[in-house]
Amino acid sequence: VSYFTVRSIAKMLEMAELSIESIQFVEYHGGSLRIFARHSSEVSNHCTDAIRIISQEIESNTFDIDTYKIFMEKTLSRRNQFLREIYRIKSLNTSIIGVGAAAKGNTFLNFYNLDNSVIDFITDISVHKQNKYTPLSRIPIVGDTVFAQYDEVYALILSWNISDILKEKLLEINP
């Protein structure tokens, strides 16, 4: 997972004698920016959207290390709360199945140290991912219909950008 600030992109483009002509916000995968650039001889400066976003980045302390220290503290606290709940569920001998074998979900699993001793399966509609294992955590990837085999199961949605679609599908498989 990578993300560049508009300020960092602007600086890289300036080194290549380019300027930001326009910026589009793209909703896909939780949001990203699509940046269009032109040679600086064709556009005098970065567009007003770029200047506005760079100002927002500065005002929100994006370039201050303390911002990331606080973020990490909050992240670790939330991870600990989440793990307490996951282990409580597992102590009840209930199955936990991950939904969606996306790369972002695997990053989540590895950061939370969740492996095949905690997550029983990962389901994915893609036959190209089925009958394989998640990297590092070694959780088997199976088809979505595995949900029909369980009376009681917890679903951990790992493809959260399409969670609404996945929830509907899971209810169809196992109402």
Mark where each language-model region is.
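Conserved S-adenosyl-L-methionine
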Residues: E17-H29
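Phosphate-bearing ligand-interacting subdomains
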Residues: R138-P175
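Short, flexible loop segments at boundaries between secondary-structure elements
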Residues: D120-T134, P175
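A short, well-structured juxtamembrane/interface segment
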Residues: K74-T94
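Flexible, glycine-/basic-rich loop-and-beta segments that form/coincide
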Residues: G30-K74
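Short alpha-helix
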Residues: V1-E17
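Substrate-recognition/cap helix-loop segment adjacent to the acidic, metal-dependent catalytic center
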Residues: T107-D120
